[in-house]
Each structure stands twice: as structure tokens, then as C-alpha cells.
Amino acid sequence: MKEIRHSRGLRDRKSHLSPDAERLVAGALGLANSGSRAEDRFWEAALAGRIEKLLDGGHSRAVHDALDRLNKADGEAYGALIEAVEDASESAVLEIDGQAWDCLLVSAPLVVWTRFRIPSGALSADAASAVSAHWYAHVLARDARFRLVPWLYSIDQLPRDFADLRKVLKRLAVSAIGGAAPRIDLKSLPETADMLADARFLLGVVAVPRGAPMFRWQEVDQPGRSASAPAHAPEAGEHASRVQCLEQWIAQVRPNLEPLLPGCGFECLLPDAYHINMRESDRRVRPFGVRAAVHFLTHALTLDASQLHASVAAFGSERIDEYRIGLVPSDSDEVAQGVVWPLLGSESEHDEPSQLEAIREVLREAGVTDIRIWPEVNEPEYCEDCGVPLYPNLK
């Protein structure tokens, strides 16, 4: 049974929250302290109903206030609430013409690196059609319906708020179920920051009849394709694992993606739910960012990787949020290139093996052997003119 915890900070500051935020905090604490799966389901349903109502009404402030409060006061309750919020923003049950549909916002991430510029932008009709066909053939369950946004997104172009994300989910879901083109504004998306290594995303929604599997790896002892399944959905066959689906996805979709990313190297990740793939792409891009920075400097400055020094320091306010890596040529005291290595989810400086060890290993693999680790935790600083992070040098 979970240990019951009482947070003095929550009681002392409760009056500063709106009633909606207070109810979210109470529900998250109830779920964190639950003693059974039956009680879990009660709290999960209560939280889901409140969160969906707030997001559908565009009232995200209460959600963010509750998350901020719990993030400072109760880590387990914060985890319960953020999981519920992410679920409400990426999934929904819609009823259309008397049929209930489970709908999920999904993404197919690409980890991309280059010495030049990583593209983002519109997919041609042929490219979008080919990519959609590969979703049906290698990722989605037999009875799934799917709608792909014909755009290769950068992280800067994805919806910034949980309410906006849920709005995109529902629009795409209606389109996937009904077949009409969705109304998604792609003309006013922001410019993309230039990075040597970054993630790109293909975004879509999968919809299935209530309770049916969404992905091929869920189809265990499933019957053949139903009459309502899309014409290009796969026929009945043996169960495919996640690994098999990923292997097939990479082999078949990569030729369609290569023309979208000229001059770039890239890896394809397994298409899956939106938020888990956001975290996975963040995790996977970190070592590529370090390698790309070293590769860029060795070519731009015509030197060997062994002639670079790395200065690594931890940054954060109340805890370590990220490590910053400054790369300094041996004939200079100035940082020539910097890389941010964020800590993700439950990661911390106490992990075994530690994130610092992972950073050291990537630097050594890239040929950088002179590595200095600063012991103290620093307040994050940014350039006053352009807002980019400031990186540690050797002094």
C-alpha cells in the first residue's frame, strides 16, 4: 500500500490556487495515495473528466498552476497529474453516427544531424500518401483509421499548450473517421531554429472502434481484417512485435523520407503516442548533438577532435535540469560551440550510470579526451541579445 504523505507546503499555500486547480491537486494526491487498482480507477476517471473539461474550454491556467504546485511539493502526485494531463491532451473518445471511437495523437520522430540545415515543412501529396501507406502496412492495427498531417514538424512548430494539442487531436480524429480533409493552419507556423542535431516529427491521429487495438503489436490472436477496414490495411497474419514493426518501418519508409532531408543523416524511431515519443526523441537526440558539434568544429576549424577541450557544468535552479557542454579549441579560451544535455523525466544526477558518465563516453567516442567537469550547480544564464544558453569555458 502506498504511504500516505501530508504536504505542509500544500496546506499553507492552498488559498492561492483557483478552485479548479485545487480540485486537480486533490485528485492527484488521492491517486498518489491510492491503496488499490479500484481506487486508482476512481481517481483517474475523476481527474480525466476535470482535465478534459478544462482543456476543451481553453482553461489551461488551472492545469499549469496545479502542476507547478505539485512539482514543488509532491513528486509522486505531480507524476500522477502530468500523466493524466498528457493522456487527456493526446487521446479522446469520440462518438460519431452512434459509433464510439478511441482516438490517439501519434508521432513518428526522426533524429536528424547535419553540417548544414535541417529542413522542416510541407510534404508533397505523393510523399504524404506513401508515408500514410507505410503507417497502415507496418504500424497500425487492421481496423484502424488514420490521418497524417502533410508536414515535417520541428519541435518549435508543435502545439505549445495542452489545450491546443487536444484541439489538433480532435480535428484530426474527425478527419480520420469521416474522411474529410482536416482544417489545420500550417501557414502561420514559426520559423525553426538552426541546430546541428535535432528531432523532426510526422504527426497524425489513429482512430479505432472503442476497445479495439490501435497498433499491430497489440494484435494477439486477432481475427482477419473487418469489412470496414481501409483497403490498404494489412491482411491477417502473425503477431508483430514492436521490434519487428520498427524494422519494417525503417526499411520501407526511409526511402520516402530521404528526399525530405538532403545533406542529413537521420534515424527513424518507432511511431507511437505523442508524449512518449517526445521524451524518447529528446533522449535520443542528445548524443547526436554532441557528435554533430564535434564533427562541425573539426571541419570548420580544420583540426582534429583531440585538439578540442570539453567543459561540462550542471545548471538548474532547485535541482539539476541540464548539463551544458562547451567545446573549446586548444589554441583558444573561448567556447566555439555548445551543446545542451537536458535531464528528462525522472532522470537525475544520482542515476547509475550517471548522465555525466554518458556525456564523457559520447565525447570520448567523438575523439575529445580532455574533459573538465565543474562540480557546482549553476543558475542558467542566457545571452541578453539573442537568448541562447551560455556555455562553460575552461576558466
Where are the predicted features?
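Short, non-ligating residues that shape and space the ligands of small metal-coordination modules
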Residues: 389-393
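Short cysteine-rich clusters marking metal-coordination/redox-active sites
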Residues: 380-386
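Long, leucine/valine-rich, helix-dominated scaffolding and oligomerization segments
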Residues: 1-175
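Extended, non-transmembrane interaction/recognition domains
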Residues: 117-375
